[in-house]
Each structure stands twice: as structure tokens, then as C-alpha cells.
From Swiss-Prot:
GO molecular function per UniProt: flavin adenine dinucleotide binding; FMN binding; NADP binding; NADPH-hemoprotein reductase activity
Entry keyword NADP: yes
Pfam families cross-referenced by the UniProt entry: FAD_binding_1, Flavodoxin_1, NAD_binding_1
The protein, known as: NADPH--cytochrome P450 reductase 1
Subcellular location: Endoplasmic reticulum membrane
Domain FAD-binding FR-type: 291-540
Cofactor note: Binds 1 FAD per monomer. Binds 1 FMN per monomer.
Keyword Glycoprotein (UniProt): no
Residue intervals annotated with topology Cytoplasmic: 51-695
Domain Flavodoxin-like: 85-235
Family (UniProt): Belongs to the NADPH--cytochrome P450 reductase family.
Encoding gene per record: CPR1
Length: 695
């Protein structure tokens, strides 16, 4: 009954005109009308509720929800004299969104007379034409922008970034705008924080006034410290813009962020009105994306390495028939996998809770009002569910905890010494020790919790502030819809090895794939929510254009899709251009994956030349960049005649070495000086003829 009334209140509030809600504090007759309307709404919703079975959830549960479009208060855009700040975020894993919300929450405490609104860039404008109209009205903006992949924007920032960087010349049209940009990236990658840097520069070029230098958050170290340092630069600038001379709000009292916490409602599992949320093939939405994935069964799983190998590489096929999911050759698939059961059991012991604990998760208070610290809450995962389900599918348990998680653990540690130690590790004074003991040692969240056994956060805190949401893992699709229209193929190397603490780290998704049960062996097969992320890693529109593909190890994945595509075109009578594949592995008797298929592509004419580097066969290690040097003349002939170059694989090592080799080939074969060589290679990238799918 309580849940039904809560649903009635929520529904009534959403349909009543704003005047009625406001009338409760004004005209008694209007207040009576509002009350009557709410009661009628409640009766209607209660009738529907009980007729439908007492609130039992539908058979097909909703997938992980997308954050709703930004709700702006009725007076947020009114000209009431208050100064306004818009805080944008472009996020892939939720970190940028978390920083944006934390910044806004602290800013509201510091500047009570100002209005702050946090906006998902994807929700800012329904159509591209609206971007300019809306931006012209902004006066102060803060942007939190993550760089993803090979210098690309995140999914939710891609449309804005494309419009802002590729649109018509706008000249000086943002002269009334003041802005600050914080980037999130990893210094190990070539295009470190490219998106933030580009947006920061373009905003200035188009008339905006930069408040502070662009923040360069580095996830390879402690990105939270980078955010804190940048934030401390921003406050004095905002003080000048938002604080009156007589305004001392927040100036003397240090701000302490509230620890985010979901509202948890424990449910008697015997209540048949509630069922554990389950998945169906369709996701109930017309959209399939990171927030609306679809369930896909594992159809095929097989080991690609030979028995002599001490490593593992898995070929997996997802069955997408009946899901509405489509893909193109070269796209990526995002996979929401499960934690290993051993990992989950350890978490259950540390939380001291039964795996059958049944509960629902809510981001608001019982009366529907925002929770304390709720401004930084992510939308809750689907519930009700058991603790076992929540830990399996939604909790990131193996990454190193952020400092905010240590603060939350400290708040719920019964041992004072443990609480003090946790707070120290999260403090500026403990920066070096946190860097060594947590980050460099690759201590997982569960390892840290085991080291502080008195820290027992309630479930609402654990899922909101301690364990981040388990993120999808991305894989280059290794098939073509021309050959496999109802399947998505994945080629995945098993992540397995010791950490500095001696723990054997097993990759969450690769381990799940290694142990997956395919439908060809059992009706009780493994499955995962998946979605397709579009990529610009595509074959030339003209199939006669020559191509060079460079992909050692699992970097072969998208090129297997390319070659399937070319084979299908060949079989349909289409003329193909020259194609060369540089592949690398350790030993032909261990890890030469898809060897038979590659030979068949050559025999059928889909592949012109296959060049393989074996790094562990001869006296000297040989890699793909060495083979490129041997084929320098051939590579230059293809490139100089309009050919395309594709690279897939490790960004930190292989892709850098290949880039250097290409630079040398262009310089020597083209007889160019260093400056002209750099310009030539950059023009290949700008023209879309030098494409990289790297991680």
C-alpha cells in the first residue's frame, strides 16, 4: 500500500499544473482544488495498481536507465536577476558527470544567490541548429570533457563536438561568454585530453573569455587530485563574477561534501508482488545505446590459441536475432558482463550480508524530495533485486577505489584508527601514500575493504559512493553483417596476471567470456546486455581503393570483419583494390589466430598479401613495425596513390611504434624534411586515410 501511495503521489505531481502545487501555500480554495485533484489522481492510480496485480513489475524489466533529460526549474531561465552558471559534461564512464555534479553542488553552497544547472551535452539541444541559439544566451559555463579512444569525444558529447568543430565559421560570436574547461584523459595515450584542448581553444577563438587554463585530468595518476587543483583555481574567478561585496556566504566555512547515499528499501522475498528484475531480448525502448542495451545470448565460444600457448584468446559470437540490434563493419560492441562468482562472494562477506538480501534502490527521499548529497547520485540500477544480482551485474569491485570511496568507508568504520587511516589516504597530505599503496600497487576495492574490516557501509552508501557502476567493455567487432547479419563476433584476449600485491588479477569481461556457456551446448546459455557503438573505422567507399591493415594479436579483429566484407563483395562480382595485412603474434604454433581463415581470404582474392611478424620464433624479436620497414617502398606506393592505412591494437606501445615507422617511411620514400613529413602524415589523418582503432 505504501508503495502504491508513493506511486500515486509521483504520478499526480507529474500531471498537475504548477499553479495547483503553488496554491497550497496561497488561496485556500486553490489549495483545496489541488488536494482534490491529487486525491482523484491517487484513486485512479490505485485502481490501476491493484487491477494490474499489486504493483508487480512487468515481465521484461527495463535495462540500466538513461539519465532523464535535464529538468530545469520553472524559474531557472526567468529574468529574476540571479546569475546563472551552466555545467556541461561529456562522459563515457561517469567520472566527468560525477565531477560536474560535485562542482555544482559545492558551488551552490558557496554562491547561494546564483543558479547552477548540470547538463548532459546530449540533452542540451534536440537539433544541431539549437546549439548556437542556446550558447549565445549563456554567460558562464564550466565544461567537463573526457577524451575517449583515439582522441575522440564520448558518446554523449559526439554530436556537440562535431557541430562545434566542423560547423560553419562562427567568427567572434561568444564575446559575452566566460568559461572554464576540465579534461579527463590518460597521459599514456597520444591524444591526451584532445577533446578538452580543442574545445578550450575554439571557445577562445570565437570570443569566449577563459577563466583558468584548461585542466588536464590524468587518469593514469590520480585524476581526483587534478580535479581538486583545477577547482581551487576556478573559485577565485567565480568569486569575482558571482559574489557581491557584502556576500560572505561560504567564504569562511570549509565545504564538506555530503556522502552520496541511495535510499534502500528491504523487501520480504516471500512477497509475490515483487520479482527479481530479468531481461528479455527487447529492451522496451526504441533506442539501443549505452543506456538502453539489449540482451544477447552467447551462441558460440571457442579458444583461438593452440594447446602449447600459456595464454588464452576467445572467439565469441553474440546472437542478435530478434533484438533489433544492427551493426556495420568496423563498429564496436559494448558488453555489460558479470563479475566472477568468487569476487561476488568475497564482497558479500565483506559487507556481512546474505546474497539473498532483497531490496530496491531509490535516488530520492521517501516523500519524493531530493536526498542529501543527491545532486551527485547516478540513476539507480534496476531493482528490486537480490544482493547477489546487484554485485554480479552492477558493482565495479576490482578497480582501485577513488579517494571519495575511502572517505565514505572512513565514515562507516567503527575502528577509529582505521577511519583515521582512510581519511589520511584520501587527504592532500596522504597523496603520495595513496599513489603508492592504492594506485601503483593496483589494490582493488575489495582488497582495500579487507584491509579495513571495520568499515561496513550500508548498502545505500556502498552502491552510491564506494563501488562505482560496472562499465561496459568495448570490443572491435570481428565480423561483417554481410557474412554474419544475425551475429556479432568478438575476439578477446584473456586478461590474467599478478599485481604488485600478489593478487592474481582476472579481467572482468575477458574472464566472463572465457567461462561463457554458448547456446550450441546448452539452453541455459550465458547472456549479456550489449549495444553497438558506431565507429569511423570503415573501409573506403570505393572498394577499388588500395588498403593497408596493421593489427597484431587481437588487433586483427576489425580486419577480419573487413576481409569478410571484401570477400562478400568479391563473391557478388565487385572489383577490389589491392589489400595488405600486417599481422603479428609470438609463435605460429601457439597464438596464430584465424590462420586458416586468413589463408582462405588470400585464396579467394579478398586479401592480396599477408605479412606476419613472429616475435618469439627467431633469435631476435620481430614486430609489425619491422615488417613495415622491409615493405617501405610498397607502403609508400599505396599511400602516395590514394590508399588508406588502418591500425588496430595497443595505443601505448604498438600504435606509437607503427606511427614512428610510418613517419620514417614517408620521410625517406617521399624525400621530405621532418616538418613536411609531419604535415603529410597529419593530412592523411585529417582526410580520413590514416585511421586508428586503439585502446
Amino acid at each position: 500500500m505504501a508503495l502504491a501511495l508513493e506511486a500515486a503521489r509521483s504520478w499526480a505531481a507529474s500531471v498537475l499544473p504548477p499553479e495547483l502545487a503553488a496554491a497550497a501555500g496561497g488561496d485556500p480554495l486553490a489549495a483545496l482544488a489541488a488536494t482534490a485533484a491529487a486525491l482523484v489522481a491517487g484513486v485512479v492510480i490505485l485502481a490501476v495498481w491493484f487491477r494490474s496485480g499489486g504493483g508487480a513489475p512487468p515481465k521484461a524489466a527495463a535495462p540500466p536507465p538513461r539519465p532523464p533529460p535535464v529538468k530545469i526549474e520553472a524559474d531557472a531561465d526567468a529574468d529574476d536577476g540571479r546569475k546563472r552558471v551552466t555545467v556541461f559534461f561529456g562522459t563515457q564512464t561517469g567520472t566527468a558527470e560525477g565531477f560536474a555534479k560535485a562542482m555544482a553542488e559545492e558551488a551552490r553552497a558557496r554562491y547561494e544567490k546564483a543558479v547552477f544547472k548540470v547538463v548532459d551535452l546530449d540533452d542540451y539541444a534536440a537539433e544541431d541548429e539549437e546549439y548556437e541559439e542556446k550558447l549565445r544566451k549563456e554567460t558562464i559555463v564550466l565544461l567537463f570533457l573526457a577524451t575517449y579512444g583515439d582522441g575522440e569525444p564520448t558518446d554523449n558529447a559526439a554530436r556537440f563536438y562535431k557541430w562545434f568543430t566542423e560547423g560553419k565559421e562562427k567568427e567572434v560570436w561568444l564575446k559575452d561568454l566566460k568559461y572554464a574547461v576540465f579534461g579527463l584523459g590518460n597521459r599514456q595515450y597520444e591524444h591526451f585530453n584532445k577533446v578538452a584542448k580543442v574545445v578550450d581553444e575554439l571557445l577562445e577563438e570565437q570570443g569566449g573569455k577563459r577563466l583558468v587554463p584548461v585542466g588536464l585530468g590524468d587518469d593514469d595518476q590520480c585524476i581526483e587530485d587534478d580535479f581538486t587543483a583545477w577547482k581551487e583555481q576556478v573559485w577565485p574567478e567565480l568569486d569575482q563574477l558571482l559574489r557581491d561585496e557584502d556576500d560572505t556566504t561560504g567564504a569562511s566555512t570549509p565545504y564538506t561534501a555530503a556522502i552520496p547515499e541511495y535510499r534502500i528499501v528491504f523487501i520480504d522475498k516471500s512477497d509475490v508482488s515483487f520479482q527479481d528484475k530479468s531481461w528479455s531480448l527487447a529492451n522496451g525502448s526504441g533506442v539501443i545505446d549505452i543506456h538502453h542495451p539489449v540482451r544477447s545470448n552467447v551462441a558460440v565460444r571457442k579458444e583461438l590459441h593452440k594447446p602449447a600457448s600459456d595464454r588464452s584468446c576467445i572467439h565469441l559470437e553474440f546472437d542478435i536475432s530478434g533484438t533489433g540490434l544492427v551493426y556495420e563493419t568496423g563498429d564496436h560492441v559494448g558488453v555489460y558482463s558479470e563479475n566472477a562468482i568468487e569476487t561476488v562472494e568475497q564482497a558479500e562477506k565483506l559487507l556481512d550480508l546474505s546474497p539473498d538480501t532483497f531490496f530496491s534502490v531509490h535516488a530520492d527521499a521517501e516523500d519524493g524530495s531530493p536526498r542529501k548529497g543527491g545532486g551527485s547520485l547516478a540513476p539507480p540500477f534496476p531493482s528490486p533485486c537480490t544482493l547477489r544480482t546487484a554485485l554480479l551485474r552492477y558493482a565495479d569491485l576490482l578497480n582501485s577505489p577513488k579517494k571519495a570511496a575511502l572517505v565514505a568507508l572512513a565514515a562507516h568504520a567503527s575502528d577509529l584508527a582505521e577511519a583515521e587511516r582512510l581519511r589520511f589516504l584520501a587527504s592532500p597530505a596522504g597523496k603520495d601514500e595513496y599513489s603508492q599503496w592504492v594506485v601503483a600497487s593496483q589494490r582493488s576495492l575489495l582488497e582495500v575493504m579487507a584491509a579495513f574490516p571495520s568499515a561496513k557501509p550500508p548498502l545505500g552508501v556502498f552502491f552510491a559512493a564506494v563501488a562505482p557502476r560496472l562499465q561496459p567493455r568495448y570490443y572491435s567487432i570481428s565480423s561483417s553483417p554481410k557474412m554474419a547479419p544475425s551475429r556479432i563476433h568478438v575476439t578477446c584476449a584473456l586478461v590474467y596476471g599478478p599485481t604488485p600485491t600478489g593478487r592474481i588479477h582476472q579481467g572482468v569481461c575477458s574472464t566472463w567470456m572465457k567461462n561463457a556457456i554458448p547456446s550450441e551446448y546448452s539452453e541455459e546459455c550465458s547472456w549479456a546486455p550489449i549495444y553497438v557503438r558506431q565507429s569511423n573505422f570503415k573501409l573506403p567507399a570505393d572498394p577499388t581503393t588500395p588498403i593497408i591493415m596493421i593489427g597484431p594479436g587481437t588487433g586483427l579483429a576489425p580486419f577480419r570483419g573487413f576481409l569478410q566484407e571484401r570477400l562478400a563483395l568479391k563473391q557478388s562480382g565487385v572489383e577490389l583494390g589491392n589489400s595488405v595485412l600486417f599481422f603479428g603474434c609470438r609463435n605460429r604454433n601457439m597464438d596464430y589466430i584465424y590462420e586458416d581463415e586468413l589463408q582462405n581470404f588470400i585464396q579467394e582474392g579478398a586479401l592480396s598479401e599477408l605479412i606476419v611478424a613472429f616475435s618469439r620464433e627467431g633469435p631476435a624479436k620481430e614486430y609489425v613495425q619491422h615488417k613495415m620497414t622491409e615493405k617501405a617502398t610498397e607502403i609508400w606506393n599505396i599511400v602516395s596513390q590514394g590508399g588508406y592505412i588502418y591500425v588496430c591494437g595497443d595505443a601505448k606501445g604498438m600504435a606509437r611504434d607503427v606511427h614512428r615507422a610510418l613517419h620514417t617511411i614517408v620521410q625517406e620514400q617521399g624525400s621530405l624534411d621532418s616538418s613536411k613529413t609531419e604535415s603529410y602524415v597529419k593530412s592523411l589523418q585529417m582526410d580520413g586515410r590514416y585511421l586508428r582503432d586503439v585502446w
